[in-house]
Amino acid sequence: MASGILLNVKEEVTCPICLELLTEPLSLHCGHSFCQACITANHKKSMLYKEGERSCPVCRISYQPENIQPNRHVANIVEKLREVKLSPEEGQKVDHCARHGEKLLLFCQEDSKVICWLCERSQEHRGHHTFLMEEVAQEYHVKLQTALEMLRQKQQEAEKLEADIREEKASWKIQIDYDKTNVSADFEQLREILDWEESNELQNLEKEEEDILKSLTKSETEMVQQTQYMRELISDLEHRLQGSMMDLLQGVDGIIKRIANMTLKKPKTFHKNQRRVFRAPDLKGMLDMFRELTDARRYWVDVTLAPNNISHAVIAEDKRQVSSRNPQIMYQAPGTLFTFPSLTNFNYCTGVLGSQSITSGKHYWEVDVSKKNAWILGVCAGFQSDAMYNIEQNENYQPKYGYWVIGLQEGVKYSVFQDGSSHTPFAPFIVPLSVIICPDRVGVFVDYEACTVSFFNITNHGFLIYKFSQCSFSKPVFPYLNPRKCTVPMTLCSPSS
């Protein structure tokens, strides 16, 4: 009776973390008490793996370090308990068979039980292999010691798995938060046309985050339970090894087999390369286009216009602006061939070049065409890089003749100039372009090594107007501006504008 009471008292003053009698007990405001060293170590572990969260290891109620109080009453009980020992009579009863009252001296290998000599002769143990406890105690001590070492190793693996799953959980949270931030930033600049797509994509990300973190949280809980199970087994083995021979041998084979057959449950994880891609309709293409412009703008060069001897073109003093003095120019409708009655009509083409030649690398610039109802711009190749350019005699807007340009006529008709047929080598074919929002500013990007020329509608969030591919850059190319018959100037924008 007394031993049962003592066991109940001992349980009340046992640390839930180390499972030993409390040492320098500290109590939380939730009522649970822990060893000072144990709760301090738990606090440090929480700071490492739970981003500063402090909660009771038993009930998980949060606490503040300043609210922890020493529990002197419990400390006194522990001190008294350490002085109390079982009476000789109670100790003697523990060593005797509960059924026969005889001394427990034998060990039954088949049943893994400590028995008396009458038990050995009973039907229950007849034919079993029995040994004196002294004969097998050392053997099983070694086996349990080996099992303990194996279990400790598995505990380390379990703790590492627990730490890894927490780290992965935090990594996923950071990664998805980072993705959400980027998505929000991109949508902020495309707000007028992407409000619905942003909301939909963020909902998908939230669902993805919820599903992944829910699964990882479940795995984390399983890993915590697994680790706790390991601690309990280790505590049991340590108790056996430190206790009597009877404690050592009672059920020893079963626990050894259980430990030997134990396998650690691995958490379900998610590989980042298995993540879904943007699924919003057309959103990926829109964002890629926007990012293409963002990347192109990294190569913005400060383009100025070269002097020329064309009487119809007027270049401003800052060499950034060109306008037409003579409005006469020949321009056919989209979808038709560009023709001239005679070569003298070339004299009415008022195109001018940028002063910078492009022979390698990536180059980007922007042209302000606001309020103009006609213009041609892009790049051209093949002219001498001297101080004066005279290109009046050679304007034939075809890529095979060194022109990669787009144009506007009548205020709303946007076109790209492509190579004409072999029957009309001097007549480019004009293909209409679909432009939803008329650009006030056009970005031009040349990738010399990739042999591409791209045109962006800056007014419409950088949407791609047209892209020339497989350009034959056999000569240096130059920025090209032609204000055409419209007297409103074209202006080269500075990188800081």
UniProtKB/Swiss-Prot annotation:
EC class of the enzyme, as a word: transferase
Cellular component terms per the entry's GO annotation: nucleus; P-body
Annotated zinc fingers (B box-type), start-end: 92-133
List of residues that carry Phosphoserine: 87
Region named Required for interaction with GABARAP and for autophagy: 187-200
Zinc finger (RING-type): 15-60
Pathway listed: Protein modification; protein ubiquitination
GO BP: activation of innate immune response; autophagy; defense response to virus; innate immune response; positive regulation of canonical NF-kappaB signal transduction; positive regulation of MAPK cascade; positive regulation of NF-kappaB transcription factor activity; protein K63-linked ubiquitination
InterPro entries: B30.2/SPRY, B30.2/SPRY_sf, Butyrophylin_SPRY, ConA-like_dom_sf, SPRY_dom, TRIM/RBCC, Znf-RING_euk, Znf_B-box
One Pfam assignment: SPRY
Protein keywords: Acetylation, Antiviral defense, Autophagy, Coiled coil, Cytoplasm, Immunity, Innate immunity, Metal-binding, Nucleus, Phosphoprotein, Transferase, Ubl conjugation, Ubl conjugation pathway, Zinc, Zinc-finger
SMART domains the record matches: BBOX, RING, SPRY
EC numbers for this chain: 2.3.2.27
Binding site for Zn(2+): 97, 100, 119, 125
Location(s), subcellular: Cytoplasm; Nucleus
N-acetylalanine modified-residue sites: 2
Residue stretches in coiled coil: 137-225
Top-level taxon: Eukaryota
Domain B30.2/SPRY, residue spans: 283-497
Domain remark in the UniProt entry: The B box-type zinc finger domain and the coiled-coil domain contribute to the higher and low order multimerization respectively which is essential for restriction activity. The coiled coil domain is important for higher order multimerization by promoting the initial dimerization. The B30.2/SPRY domain acts as a capsid recognition domain. Polymorphisms in this domain explain the observed species-specific differences among orthologs.
Family: Belongs to the TRIM/RBCC family.
Role: Capsid-specific restriction factor that prevents infection from non-host-adapted retroviruses. Blocks viral replication early in the life cycle, after viral entry but before reverse transcription. In addition to acting as a capsid-specific restriction factor, also acts as a pattern recognition receptor that activates innate immune signaling in response to the retroviral capsid lattice.
Protein name in the entry: Tripartite motif-containing protein 5
Organism (species): Macaca assamensis
